[in-house]
Regions:
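Structural recognition of the beta-strand scaffold that forms the well-ordered cores
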Residues: 22-27, 32-34, 63-69, 146-150, ...
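Short charge-dense sequence patches
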Residues: 2-5, 66, 78-85
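Conserved SGNH/GDSL esterase-like catalytic core that processes O-acyl groups on lipids
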Residues: 1-53
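A substrate-binding/cap region within the structured catalytic cores of diverse enzymes
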Residues: 19, 70, 77
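Catalytic His-Asp segment of secreted/periplasmic serine-dependent ester chemistry enzymes
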Residues: 75-180
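Surface-exposed, flexible loop/turn segments at secondary-structure boundaries
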Residues: 32, 73-76
Length: 180
């Protein structure tokens, strides 16, 4: 989630005077909406500003940041839900099992509860609006930046137009992460 991303970013140790410029990619995917009520927009805003401000204190001048928004994870349910998991059950049942035993990777998207999935997607899109607000007003001294929406739909459409099955883009083991 965005709060933990700040902790991870602090592991980056750079010398602003002697190091060459960096290309930093920041992608939160769905972590801010995966569990419980998710990160509230105002907390998300504070977390992202905190990350951006901190990066400006460590990135060498001339660095670049590419930010990618949160994914609309409802697409996972659409692609995977009724397909069969390698354990022999539909992915929806597999997701519910993981929720039941408390080891789900993203309980708000990986579920058979369509209402919960739709609510989670709406929360993710609301956080993407916060991203848009931040990046339309933010200025950094040591790096420039660009922000993109998470291109899941485009990737899936492109894959399908080339004859691929969208099911093959997602790991068949966890039913969530991109397949390798």
């Amino acid at each position: 989630a965005s709060g933990g991303t700040f902790d991870n970013a602090q592991l980056m140790n750079r010398n602003q005077t002697t190091d060459k410029p960096l290309l930093v990619i920041m992608e939160l995917a769905a972590n801010d909406v995966c569990f419980g009520q998710g990160t509230q927009p105002e907390d998300f805003r504070k977390n992202i500003y905190r990350i951006l401000d901190w990066l400006d204190t460590v990135l060498p001048p001339g660095s670049h940041l590419v930010s990618i928004g949160l994914v609309n994870g409802s697409i996972i349910h659409e692609i995977m839900g009724t397909k069969t998991h390698p354990m022999g059950m539909p992915f929806n049942d597999f997701y519910d099992y993981l929720n039941c035993v408390g080891v789900d990777l993203c309980e708000n998207y990986l579920t058979s509860n369509v209402t919960k999935i739709q609510e989670t997607a709406a929360k993710a899109m609301a956080l993407n609006k916060v991203y848009e607000e931040i990046f339309s007003n933010y200025t950094a001294k040591n790096y420039d930046f660009v922000h993109y929406d998470f291109p899941a739909e485009w990737i899936i459409e492109k894959w399908a137009s080339q004859g691929g099955d969208p099911f093959d883009l997602i790991s068949h083991v966890d039913g969530f992460h991109p397949s390798q």
